[in-house]
Amino acid sequence: MNNKPEYITCAAIWYKDLPTQTYPPKNIDKGIVVCGHRHNNCIDVVKTLSELRTVRFSPDGVGESVQGFMTSENRFVDRQEAMGIAKTTGQVDESKLYNPMTGLFSEDIY
């Protein structure tokens, strides 16, 4: 049994309007979640594989998306929930946060 608390593993973007993936994170019921070192890596993967842009209202847009993070428990969390997890687990130096009101940025933890 793993007694380690849930922690942030990587940046991720949930593309809600794209076709549902076969093995999504356990708290996602539609769309796909793309993971990467930074959020721009996720955007680049979608653009490269689908030629769609990460914008909502455009003929070549992906539709609704949410920037967030994946956790060690295979959950997608938004920037605000990720900030709480990262603070609880000591993954961030609270005196050096990029924009704590917006939520966690990958630059805050690595």
Segment roles from a protein language model:
Residues 1-66, 71-110:
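Linear-motif-rich, low-complexity cytosolic tails and juxtamembrane regions
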